[in-house]
Amino acid sequence: MIRTFFLALVLSLASAAAQSADLQSFGRGSWSKLRAAHDGQPTVVHFWGLTCAPCLVEMPEWGKLRAERPDMRLVMVAADPVPQDPTRVSEMLARADLGKAENWAFTDRFNERLRYEIDPAWAGELPRTLLIDRDGKETVLSGVADLAEVRAWLDTQKTR
């Protein structure tokens, strides 16, 4: 019985560690690196948080959209006002079928600096979605995103 419990515990910890491996640390300079990595590619960047109830409600819908549009460049950024436990962030992403998306989490306690790098006018409201076209032009969706609008934007970008 104890061996079974110990084995289950080890497997559980290994699973959590594997999920966390997909979570990148978002600190100073990460936004410019992220933008450079996706330069010239239509990209959806969704900012969400564990402490944001509307974010948690819409997460499974983002997972469905990603499954529906496997070629879509979707970047999920956990942008809680206070950095959260990476394991909890990874678990939420996995539950929403987003564990294999490009996932980041704010790790700087001075998140105002991170938000300023992204958009000097952003006060930190969540959820927030940026639709970035091939030319780098951003469309900002503040609040729960209308995924029909996101799909329509993806269609204009020829993203499936």
Locate the predicted segments by residue.
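Bacterial N-terminal signal peptides
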Residues: 4-14
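Boundary at the C-terminal end of the N-terminal hydrophobic targeting segment
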Residues: 16-20
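A short beta-strand-turn-helix
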Residues: 22-43
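Loop/turn elements at helix/coil->beta-strand transitions in domains of secreted/extracellular proteins
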Residues: 39-43, 70-73, 99-101
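Aromatic-flanked redox-active Cys/Sec active sites in thiol-based oxidoreductases
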Residues: 46-52
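Structural microenvironment flanking redox-active thiols in thiol-disulfide oxidoreductases
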Residues: 57-97, 111-113
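Short, internal strand/loop/helix patches
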Residues: 93-126
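Thiol-/selenol-based redox modules, centered on thioredoxin-like
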Residues: 126-160
